[in-house]
Amino acid sequence: MAITAQLVKQLRERTGAGMMDCKKALTETNGDIDAAVDYLREKGIAKAAKKADRIAAEGTTYVASSGNTAVLLELNSETDFVARNEGFQALVKEMADHILATKPADLDALMASEIETGKTVETKLNEAISTIGEKLTLRRFVLAEKTDADAFGEYLHMGGRIGVLAVVENSTDAEAAKDVAMHIAALNPKFVSREQVSAEELEHEKEILKQQALNEGKPENIVEKMVEGRLRKYLEEICAVDQPFVKNPDQTVAEFLKSKGGSLKSFVRYEVGEGIEKRQDNFADEVMGQMGK
């Protein structure tokens, strides 16, 4: 497979590794970018990629609750200017209220649902597009339920750039739940606890850590212990309950919630535009792209 300049660029963006290292990794893995990420990590050249898609789309996240139901949603616009527009913000709130009231099963059901007499959500959005003059996309939403004995943690960071909805069990301390949601916004864990990490992911990480240790020239007899220690540290980094609590690093999130009589049941974290990349090719990139073909 031809290793194009665009492929090298993508790998550099995902790993932060140098151009020649990326080119070699892609050559060794026959252009498989995921395998190339692993190759670079095994060589100690790149850190674990945390969903390294560039954040590019504009818009906002929004979180709201009513009784024992809460919603987190993302509404995208083309520019940040529109995202701060009062009409846009009112639309976001209206969508959240509608979702809480109707509890649609998915995005398709939401778009087809009636938000006003004779008017669907899709029609409402199209009208807003005509008024505002930009393409708007209701990209995603999630609903969460709790009992009277639980609490929602609702947090918006940077005016909605990041939104978090957490459910804390066996505690009605909404302030503590909000603090945990703020922690999740800041540290971006992947899982609630290590029980949620699949055996496949653990084995994958173990293999990478083993290769790292071997490539560092460590003796075989101590590699296993090194892998165990590094895997434990990796799990502490990706599991919310094991992370040092952002407001008091002397205790973990689990310990903080335990002091309030609760535990973290679930969370969802949205960051505006994650996974969406605007095309931003400049002339130099275009020329490199042509040369690489």
From Swiss-Prot:
SUPFAM superfamilies: Elongation factor Ts (EF-Ts), dimerisation domain, UBA-like
Annotated region described as Involved in Mg(2+) ion dislocation from EF-Tu, given as residue ranges: 79-82
PROSITE patterns per the UniProt record, alphabetical: EF_TS_1, EF_TS_2
Record's subcellular location: Cytoplasm
Pfam family for this entry, one: EF_TS
GO cellular component, one term: cytoplasm
Key words of the record: Cytoplasm, Elongation factor, Protein biosynthesis
UniProt feature coiled coil, ranges: none
Primary location group: cytoplasm
Gene Ontology MF: a single term: translation elongation factor activity
Family indicated by similarity: Belongs to the EF-Ts family.
Function: Associates with the EF-Tu.GDP complex and induces the exchange of GDP to GTP. It remains bound to the aminoacyl-tRNA.EF-Tu.GTP complex up to the GTP hydrolysis stage on the ribosome.
Name of this chain's protein: Elongation factor Ts
Annotated source species: Macrococcus caseolyticus (strain JCSC5402) (Macrococcoides caseolyticum)
Taxonomic lineage: Bacteria, Bacillati, Bacillota, Bacilli, Bacillales
Gene (name only): tsf
